[in-house]
Design a protein with these regions (language model features):
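Positively charged, low-complexity intrinsically disordered leader regions
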Residues: 1-71, 75
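Residue-level preference for short coil/turn positions at secondary-structure junctions
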Residues: 15, 53-54, 131, 166, ...
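Conserved beta-strand segments of alpha/beta enzyme cores
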Residues: 18, 83, 134, 193, ...
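A short acidic, often aromatic-flanked loop/helix-cap motif at beta-alpha or helix-coil junctions
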Residues: 27, 141-145, 229-234
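Short glycine-/small-residue-rich Rossmann-like dinucleotide-binding loops
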Residues: 38, 63, 119, 242-244
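Generic structural signal for well-ordered alpha-helical scaffold segments
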Residues: 38-42, 152-160, 184
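Phosphate/diphosphate ligand-binding glycine-rich loop within oxidoreductases
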Residues: 45-156
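Glycine-rich phosphate/diphosphate-binding loop of Rossmann-like nucleotide-binding domains
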Residues: 63-76, 157-241
Length: 244
């Protein structure tokens, strides 16, 4: 794979591409991202990680606590030659003494990328509206795109019988969280089968199911929302979560 040098990577481009939800990406784009992930995973094993982020900084806003997302972003930025800044609400004036719009403007001038884990979609939308650099959604109560990419990558690595993702059915055992919503939409884009299995009161909202089904019409996937636990029997992947 031919990779650009950091000096050739212009993050401050005119047409900024954010990562808000995997539903915004095509299957080809998601495949390309996973190909890069595979390359970088092997490069780390070989102690030869390319310095794609050399001289760059990512400002990480965390309204909510995190273990995996925070650590993975910090480690990734360091391995790629860059720097990650952890910014909690007590560290910056996020919507307090300073508007979210102003925070976004200021961070855009100083950082090359903004990553945000927010307690509301409105906070993320405010950052997106005024940012002049790419914004990555680290979870905003609606979507969790980086988790979805990691999950698909893991599934693909563990299905070793030659089947493609669009030949698989995934069962999600849990309530209608951002993870469930993101999984359903991502599976639908890929043409995978998706089943949410659990008590009716925890089922996904109809408007999101309708959106996923619209993706399935193009991809060939299928969606099932059920309280029948026996429906797990013909699934290839089981994803466990909690019922709150």
């Amino acid at each position: 794979m031919k990779l650009p040098s950091s000096s050739a990577t212009d993050l401050h481009k005119a047409n900024i591409e954010h990562m808000v939800s995997m539903k915004d990406f095509s299957v080809r784009e998601m495949d390309n991202m996973m190909e890069l992930m595979s390359y970088l995973k092997q490069a780390r094993k070989d102690n030869a990680v390319p310095q794609l982020f050399k001289g760059k900084s990512v400002g990480m806003i965390f309204e909510a606590g995190s273990t995996r997302t925070r650590v993975s972003f910090e480690v990734a930025a360091t391995l790629l030659g860059g720097h990650a800044l952890f910014l909690s609400p007590k560290d910056i004036h996020l919507g307090g003494k300073e508007s979210i719009d102003d925070t976004s403007r200021v961070l855009s001038r100083m950082c090359d990328v903004i990553m945000a884990r927010t307690n509301s979609p409105e906070t993320l939308d405010g950052l997106l509206n005024m940012s002049t650099v790419p914004v990555i959604n680290g979870l905003d109560t609606r979507f969790h795109p980086t988790q979805m990419l990691a999950d698909l990558f893991t599934i693909r690595e563990h299905i070793t019988d030659g089947r493609q993702l669009n030949e698989l059915t995934l069962a999600f055992m849990g309530d209608a969280t951002d993870v469930c919503r993101s999984l359903m939409l991502t599976c639908a884009k890929y043409g995978m089968g998706f089943k949410q299995i659990g008590p009716v009161k925890y089922h996904m909202e109809p408007e999101w199911v309708e959106l996923a089904e619209s993706f399935c019409k193009e991809s060939g996937g299928h969606i099932e929302i059920t309280d029948d636990v026996e429906r797990i029997s013909d699934c290839d992947v089981v994803y466990g979560d909690s019922f709150y």
